[in-house]
């Protein structure tokens, strides 16, 4: 069985391969392959995003809340909650000038905060959250939305974790850009 093209491209472009003794990398690669297959068979982008948040939440034990925030077509300066899973109620919408999600959207760069108590941009969703990562998702160079991950553990997000979630975002971008 061959790796689906979007996942193969993402893994190759990221330079990520499992190395002996690096269990996390292997777990990431296995999950990326699984999500690549999901991207090939998903009927809608919402179905793909649902699969991504569920699998990240189920597989990555320190990912306590995983969700997508999407650019609101009616209010382009606002992110609205998309597919999500986790143990607390998230913000329904976030202005692009607020929070870590707003920072990732306006800078168009991944934001990783391994101690949210030390970052004044953090918008509290739960007192239990200790670290957060927000990864932008682009479609044809325009911001489509972002993957937001909250953890109840400080220092959850390593550079490898960041690359992994950026690869998941690239799968969504690839899905959005494929001809229909």
Which sequence ranges carry the predicted segments?
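Sensory-domain boundary capping and coupling elements
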Residues: 138-151
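Regulatory sensory and allosteric helical modules in signal-transduction proteins
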Residues: 70-127
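Amphipathic alpha-helical regulatory segments at dimerization interfaces
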Residues: 34-41, 50-59, 103, 171, ...
């Amino acid at each position: 069985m061959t790796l689906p093209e979007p996942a193969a491209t993402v893994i190759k472009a990221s330079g990520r391969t499992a190395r002996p003794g690096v269990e996390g990398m292997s777990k990431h690669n296995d999950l990326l392959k699984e999500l690549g297959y999901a991207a090939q068979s998903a009927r809608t982008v919402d179905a793909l995003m649902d699969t991504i948040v569920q699998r990240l939440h189920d597989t990555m034990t320190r990912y306590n809340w995983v969700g997508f925030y999407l650019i609101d077509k009616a209010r382009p300066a606002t992110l609205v909650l998309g597919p999500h899973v986790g143990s607390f109620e998230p913000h329904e919408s976030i202005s692009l000038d607020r929070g870590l999600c707003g920072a990732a959207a306006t800078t168009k760069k991944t934001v990783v905060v391994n101690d949210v108590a030390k970052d004044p941009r953090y918008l509290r969703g739960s007192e239990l959250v200790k670290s957060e990562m927000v990864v932008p998702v682009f479609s044809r160079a325009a911001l489509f939305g972002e993957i937001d991950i909250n953890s109840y553990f400080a220092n959850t997000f390593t550079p490898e974790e960041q690359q992994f979630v950026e690869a998941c975002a690239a799968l969504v971008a690839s899905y959005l850009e494929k001809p229909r």
